[in-house]
Amino acid sequence: ELVGRANAKLLTVCTFHAFGCEVLRRHLWRLGYPKRFAIADASDQLSLVKRAMRETKIDDRSFDARRVLALVSKAKCAGVVPEPKPEGMGDEYDLVTAAVFPRYQLALKAQGAVDFDDLILLPIRLLREHPEVREELVERYRYLLVDEYQDTNRSQLDLLVMLAGERKNVCAVGDDDQSIYSWRGAEVDNILSFDRHFPKVKEVRLEQNYRSSQAILDAANAVIAVNEARKPKRLWTARGL
């Protein structure tokens, strides 16, 4: 209603993963995958990890395949390839994950499949390795808005930076104090260091709260103030005590 039907049709509203999936539907063949690909579910992923463990002579009775899969996913969210850590650092699971990762990826590709994390990683690879794809997407998406920015991971940030191109027309909405998903890869530093990735940023603080009483907000302000690694803000309300 605000922008009109014609302009509304020009908008793309979706999650990071839905966006990545659409990019892959159009361009994944450029990376040697079939034009029609499948998205592996949790059961498929676990099966492929167990196969990779057998191929590398790793006993799945000694190492939990589910934990290995979780570490593979964690690495993908961070945008890194698991590698053996220097002696004295890490543990045996780091070594197992580093050994399993390449075989797991090859097994996915051999089946014409990607996993959920690949919906972010493979579009990044496409943009890096195929300038024509990057130019097309940067031109198509000139303005980018990301909600709940404190919940983004490193791979999502990398994709956003590449899509923003030289224009860097990015609006992020989020609250570092509400970052609670680090256990699944979210990095609060993405919002804390926003101005490093997108210079000349204008910051707008939305400190008025419409849900809680001032007594609750005072308690919340006191608790969160202990955290030194945050954007300074103080919530208030017009609702009274």
For the regions a language model picked out, list residue spans one by one.
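Conserved helicase NTPase motor core
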Residues: T12, A38-D44, G90-S193, R205-A215
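Coupling/hinge elements of helicase-like and P-loop NTPase modules
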Residues: D60-A70, P82, P86-E87, V204-L241
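N-terminal helical cap/lid subdomain that shapes the substrate entry/recognition surface
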Residues: A18-F19, S73, V201-K202
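Short, flexible turn/loop "capping" segments at secondary-structure junctions
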Residues: A172, R196-P199, T237-L241
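P-loop NTPase Walker
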Residues: E1-K35, I39, Q111, R134-E135, ...
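Coupling/switch/interface segments within P-loop NTPase motor domains and analogous charged loops
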Residues: A42-L108
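Short regulatory helix/loop adjacent to the ATP-binding pocket of P-loop NTPases
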Residues: E22-L28, I180-H197, Q214, D218-N221, ...
